């Protein structure tokens, strides 16, 4: 929070506050969708709390000289768990592991009616699919209703995070060339990874080649 760019590199951890001049083009599509300016620097505002669940953010590091500003944000769901000489470390009680499924999808036409500031909340409820993807995968999920789309309170967000967490992968390991994940699903479904989509990715499920889909305007 309001700290150095690329702090995650110092700690060998992934981080959503990041400066990098070589990024996957799809991230330039995704971030404006959810109300975040993106060029070579990503720095989502703390007020966009639902993005933290969607992007599997577990901790926020707050410089000690910025604690007063952090407290003024009055953000729910963050608990102080540790500290260093320079930082206070807060844990996200609504953290969702990297890689999870949905019970619902939302079409591009329906998603266009959602404001940028509420987009993160809606994307915790439903997977954004193109019309072609709805034809291919729509039978796996329900079409999000307008009533469900409009339920975007913090309490709704907590419930959505809980639901996504219950369907999350059991392990996720980043590698030099990509990542591996394990999941135990009751039925066939799409698994969202908040990784920028790129044509160079390939995937296998139980050793069988699988399609990698671009969803949520830039994730996969």
Question: Would you name each region that the model predicts?
Answer:
Residues 1-55, 95-161, 198, 209:
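Extracytoplasmic/lumenal acceptor-recognition loop(s) of multi-pass membrane glycoenzymes
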Residues 2-5, 60, 66-68, 96-97, ...:
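Solvent-exposed loop/turn segments at secondary-structure junctions
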Residues 9-16, 72-83, 87:
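Active-site regions of enzymes building and remodeling cell-envelope glycoconjugates
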Residues 38-82:
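Periplasmic/luminal catalytic loop of GT-C fold multi-pass membrane glycosyltransferases
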Residues 62-64, 92, 183-185:
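Short beta-strand-to-loop capping motifs
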Residues 88-95:
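Conserved beta strand-loop-helix elements of the APE1-like EEP
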Residues 141-220:
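Active-site-proximal, structured, solvent-exposed surfaces of multi-pass membrane proteins
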